[in-house]
Amino acid sequence: MAIHSFRPLTPAGRFTSLNKREGLSKKRPQKALTEPKPKTGGRNVYGRITTRHIGGGHKQLYRIIDFKRDILDMPATVEALEYDPNRTSNLALVVYANGEKKYILAPEGLQVGAKIFASNKATTNDYNVGNNFPLHLIPPSTRVHAVELVPGRGAKIARAAGTGLELVAVEGDRATLKMPSGELRLVNAKCRATIGEVGNGDHNNQSLGKAGRRRWLGVRPTVRGMVMNPVDHPNGGGQGKSKGGGGRQQLVSPWGQLAKGFPTRRRSKQSNAQIIVHHNGRKPRGKK
């Protein structure tokens, strides 16, 4: 999709550039594949704010997406490409040979009318965009997206617009993936993945142009902790552009977590054992 800029008839229009959304269906989503999406305002069941900067925005329906791709060896036809307000990528509405309809993430290059399928066996001519296979059947150096972390639990990584992983190698029951961050990670070779990269790669090149468009998306303003009062934030108070006292020498989060130069990932996290090289090029502790 191309980026569309506007004539500067208003101050907001001068700075706005948006996706054209060419080729997307203008029909309403499939009713059987949607659910209500109630607003929370970032509050939990006790009414306390647990996630800041959430509130308002346009009403949205949640689209039920097939992340498992568990209908095997049955061809499906892409009926339409649709916009999804709940994520950065677009969706593809596919119709299987038995008439069942599903939403999947729309890969880059997938066209209306294309034939796709998922299978546990593959030949040389089957590695087309949108087809889904276990990692051990996919050739090395292939770009994939919507990859499972645990077999059968559905895709968990590489689901945002424009993202994709590189399948580096498959050795035994483990596959090595290169993440968009540069991290090298091991996953079970039985995990499923979809060929290609997620579409709508120009999403990051958009400029919303005005605060109101961000509010339409349900995002409220962000206030820096340094300009708050001491009662509202650990970095609040002080004279001018400086944080207050209280014995702190470093910037912290609203809950006191060090914000600069401090690794926030837990060392006890189980998936640490599956990381070969971190995104910064360093190997995990204890690995040579």
From Swiss-Prot:
SMART domains: Ribosomal_L2, Ribosomal_L2_C. Pfam families: Ribosomal_L2, Ribosomal_L2_C. Keywords: Ribonucleoprotein, Ribosomal protein, RNA-binding, rRNA-binding. InterPro entries: NA-bd_OB-fold, Rib_uL2_dom2, Ribosomal_uL2, Ribosomal_uL2_bac/org-type, Ribosomal_uL2_C, Ribosomal_uL2_dom3, Ribosomal_uL2_RNA-bd_dom, Translation_prot_SH3-like_sf. Residues 1-46, 226-288 are annotated as: Disordered. One of its GO terms (biological process) is cytoplasmic translation. Residues 235-248 have a biased composition (Gly residues). GO terms for cellular component: large ribosomal subunit. Residues 279-288 have a biased composition (Basic residues). One of its GO terms (molecular function) is transferase activity. The keyword Ribosomal protein applies. Gene3D superfamilies: 2.30.30.30, Nucleic acid-binding proteins, Ribosomal protein L2, domain 3. Part of the 50S ribosomal subunit. Forms a bridge to the 30S subunit in the 70S ribosome. Belongs to the universal ribosomal protein uL2 family. One of the primary rRNA binding proteins. Required for association of the 30S and 50S subunits to form the 70S ribosome, for tRNA binding and peptide bond formation. It has been suggested to have peptidyltransferase activity; this is somewhat controversial. Makes several contacts with the 16S rRNA in the 70S ribosome. This is Large ribosomal subunit protein uL2. It comes from Opitutus terrae (strain DSM 11246 / JCM 15787 / PB90-1).
